[in-house]
From Swiss-Prot:
May have a role in hematopoietic cell differentiation. Residues 1-41 form the signal peptide. The keyword Secreted applies. It comes from the Eukaryota. GO terms for cellular component: extracellular region. It is found in: Secreted. Its main location: secreted. It comes from Macaca mulatta (Rhesus macaque). The keyword Secreted applies. This is Lymphocyte antigen 6 complex locus protein G5c. N-glycosylated. Disulfide bonds join C62-C89, C65-C74, C81-C107, C116-C133. Residues 60-140 form the UPAR/Ly6 domain.
Amino acid sequence: MRFMAGPAGSQNPGPMCFHSSLQALYTVLLIVLVMMSLVFGKFVPVNWERPQPLPVPKYLRCYRCLLETKELGCLLGSDTCLTPAGSSCITLHIKNGSNSDVMVSDCRSKEQMSDCSHTQTSPVSGFWMFSQCCFLGFLQ
């Protein structure tokens, strides 16, 4: 077995070695970027201003599904629809006495908003329907 004398013998190539080589790599990269900036004369200033807030969307995006159950998810027609300001998204729950729940989701225009948030009996005996809307207050 060989033993090394002097400072080389006390170095242990481990995590510190990796850290120092990574730090050296970052230093070289920084020097190269500064030199390129000086040679080519292009300097990209850093924008320290706070970013402007995103504009309020003009449309409300609603989930649309023609037949959905909690157990199986959407079975028919899964996509999204856009509805203009003043309109809403609606989910119609159709339930029976055994707590089975079938849902229909869609967009609702201003004229159809009377359907929102009320319960009614279904034309089919033993079932009832509950509609639930969500809307967003749009800025004009």
